[in-house]
Structure formats: C-alpha cells, structure tokens
Amino acid sequence: MPRLSDTIGRLVGQRMADAMTTTHGEDRLSDLTDFGANPGNLRARVYVPAQLQPRPALVVVLHGCTQTAAGYDSGAGWSQLADVAGFVLLFPEQRRANNPNLCFNWFAPEDMAGGHGEVASIRAMIAAMGAAHGVDPSRVFVTGLSAGGAMTAAMLANYPEVFAGGAIIGGLPYGTAHGVSQALERMRGRDLPDAAALTAAVRGASHHDGPWPTLSVWHGGTDATVHPANAEALLNQWRGLFGIGETPAEEALVGGNPHRVWRDRHGRVVIEDHRILAMGHGTPIATHGAEAAGQAGPFMLDVGLSSTRRIAAFWGIARVVGAAEGRAADAGGARDGGVAGIVNDALRAAGLLR
C-alpha cells in the first residue's frame, strides 16, 4: 500500500508543478551518504567551498516541486555565493519514490512533525554537517521555494532552537494543511487561519519558548500557484511569535518593489518581507549587475534582484548588496506620503493590502 504522502503528493504536487520543470545546469554538489537516521528517505547533497570561514555558517536549501538540488543551486546561485562568503551548504533532495513530483511532503502529518519523516531526516543531515565541518551552531539557516518553502516553515517550527534564521520563497505557513483538500485550499489562499491560530501552531510544534529564528519572506504579487495571501499569513504567524504588531518599523522600495521590516522590542530586525509585484511563482534572481548570481530558467525568475544574495545579507553571512531606493525613516509617523505611501499604494494596487 502506498504511503499517504504518495497519494496526497500526486494531487498537491501536480498543482504546484503544473508549470514547473527542472532547472538544468552544472552539478556542483556532492553526496552525503552517511548522516544517520533517514525516516523520510531523502537524499542529501552538499557543497563545501575550497575556502571555508573558521566555524562556518551552514545554509540548508530546499528545492521546489519537479526540481533537483543541483538544478536549484544552478538557478539560485547558492554555491557561487558560498565560494565568496565561505559558508557550507546542505541540499536535502526529494526522491520520486516519496513524491512523484519531487515535492517535499509539507502537508503530510507523517513528514511534518518533529522527530518523524522528512523533517527528522533533514535534522539528521544538519547534525552530520555540523560535526563534519565545525559549523557554528549559532549560524545555521534554512531556505526554500514553494513546497521547499513550506518545508522550511516546518523545520523552523519543529526545530526553532537549531536555526538562527529562515527564508521562505513562494511558500506557506506551518500547520495550515493536514491532507490534500486543505493543502489545495491553502495554496489558493482560502480559509487560512487567523493570526492567533497561526502562531499557536508554531508554539505547539515544540517545547521551545524563544528566542525565535528571524524570517525573510519573498513572494510574487502575481503568484498563481501559491496565493500571496500565504505570505501575509506567514508574517502574521511570526509577528505573533515575536510579539510585534502589524505596522512595519521601516518601509522601502527595492528595485521598485515593496520591502517591509519589523523590529523586536530590542530594536533588532527580526522579520522582512519582499513583495515582487509583477512576479509569478519562483525564486527571484539577478543575472546582471553587482548582485548577479545563478541563471534564469523555469521558476528561476530574473527580476534584477538576487533573493539569494539579499537573504544571505539579511542573515549576516554575506556582504550587503545594493541599497534601498528610498526608505521611510519612521514608519510610525505619517503613513500617506513619501516612500511609505508609495509602498502601501503598490501593495493595495496588487490586492495585497487592505
């Protein structure tokens, strides 16, 4: 009898993968074959640059449906950046035996609960990489696209003590779907839980009570695969964890697109949101200019902004690239003029802000 996640995966994965095809490119990754328990039956790929920083950071990268680890790396340019910044990369990879569309099973109860299935396999890989390369345990991060983004949310929820930060691209919040019908509805942006329930889902996933990982959210304003309402739900989920309100501390235009920042009560930046208004479903990349990294392809979308470089900069493990085109110095002040007004107008025009 096939696993429940197999059946669910065929349906949910097909929707997520309708237009997605594997991004091909040079395979710079190696296999990690002995990392301990693997209840999720995942493959582990890794990249270790020739020049490592002392006690390097570790970045875990989770591909989207129909993609491979090597294809995602080629498109997003993570190993390119690792060569410069000296951090280690771990790319868990789905197997077709688990999911015919190569989606991580973010919606299957047996794969999204701590200590079980795919999340447990990824956790074991992280431990093995940390031991093998002397990774700084305070600088472990995770990011992913689409189903990989939703699995990123699951990793952050189940193992918050492991991660300093996460970045979710075109993904969904944790704990909103348990089965095929719910997964499809959430992807359409329907019946998402309220902020309190979203936050409670993360708090209930572990015994952790803080500090919480920081979060970078990226979403296309015209994403027809995972509705942008999921980005707002993610923000609600994590603002609740940090105990901060809806109003951002700062707003800016980056590449003509809204960028919002939230700070905790100590003034530390803990959440950011990049909304690429004219972009559909995929990972934002730049193929030219100072922040060029990776290569364009299916669901590797050249919008002139490298999410890879900017996420790494947000985490503090790579050089900051570029600068905001304009910034509202005090987002708590006048909301209708200047950059803050432009950002809000842009979000409203895209139907992303009431």
Q: What role is predicted for each listed range?
A:
Residues 1-58, 70-76, 84, 114, ...:
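A domain-start/cap signature at the N-terminus of enzymes
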Residues 52-100, 176:
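Short substrate-entry loop that stabilizes the transition state in hydrolases
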Residues 93-117, 179-180:
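Cap/lid segment of the alpha/beta-hydrolase catalytic domain
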Residues 110-133, 154:
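Alpha/beta-hydrolase active-site loop
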Residues 142-144, 169, 218:
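Short beta-strand immediately N-terminal to the catalytic nucleophile in serine-hydrolase-like folds
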Residues 149-161, 167:
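Short glycine-enriched nucleophile-adjacent loop
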Residues 217-219, 223:
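Short beta-strand/loop motif that positions the catalytic acidic residue
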Residues 225-230, 284-285:
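Conserved alpha/beta-hydrolase "acid-adjacent" motif
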